[in-house]
Amino acid sequence: MPKVGMREVRRAQLIDATLLTIDQSGLSGTTLASVAQRANISTGIVSHYFGDKDGLLEATMRHILRDLWAATTRRRIAAKAQPRARLRAIVAANFDVSQVSGPVMKTWLAFWSESMHEPALRRLQHVNTRRLYSNLCAEFAKELPRACARRAASGLAAMIDGLWLRGALSGDPFDTKAALRLANDYIDLLLAQSAA
């Protein structure tokens, strides 16, 4: 009989092992067996919890996305009610420590690539994209006309993704301060235009 609570402990252990395996071997080198070996358990247990490699990647991405959404919620709550502060909070959440470690960044890159081919991953990517756009648009709409708010949200979302992607591909540790500075300058520029 399994121990109570062991399912979540084991799933977390396997997700951590997946992140580390993708970091070391890439997605193509990540197998149920390599994840099981890293977690020091049998391949059958990995199959039991996730079914196959696609199920394991989906669960890993859901974990990363939950961390992102939690960081976004936490930072938005801590921000002042002003749209500028809330926009900056959304940006900061996307560059949160939970999103910019080497293993997480490499897993994001693998996820983006696979989401073009796997419907379940495509749905996750779509939800994430829509959530970011919706959050940004809601804040910009408090300061800008609706059409301008939509353009601003699209532009800032593209900037966040671009800064993140350049950082991920650089091979160096992610420069969170530089990314925040650029994105926050862009927010200031957009909001200054509305005040003019």
Curated annotation (Swiss-Prot):
UniProt xrefs under PROSITE patterns: HTH_TETR_1, HTH_TETR_2
User: InterPro entries from the xrefs?
Assistant: BetI_C, DNA-bd_HTH_TetR-type_CS, Homeodomain-like_sf, HTH-type_TetR-like_transc_reg, HTH_TetR, Tet_transcr_reg_TetR-rel_C_sf, Tscrpt_rep_BetI
Q: Is DNA-binding included in the keywords of this UniProt record?
A: yes
**Alphabetical keyword list:** DNA-binding, Repressor, Transcription, Transcription regulation
- Pfam families, from UniProt? TetR_C_6 (PF13977), TetR_N (PF00440)
Q: Name one GO molecular function term.
A: transcription cis-regulatory region binding
Pathway where it operates: Amine and polyamine biosynthesis; betaine biosynthesis via choline pathway [regulation]
Q: Which Gene3D superfamilies match?
A: Tetracycline Repressor, domain 2 (1.10.357.10)
Sorted alphabetically, the Gene Ontology BP terms of this entry are: glycine betaine biosynthetic process from choline; negative regulation of DNA-templated transcription
Give the DNA-binding residues. Answer: 31-50
Known function: Repressor involved in the biosynthesis of the osmoprotectant glycine betaine. It represses transcription of the choline transporter BetT and the genes of BetAB involved in the synthesis of glycine betaine.
Provide the protein name: HTH-type transcriptional regulator BetI
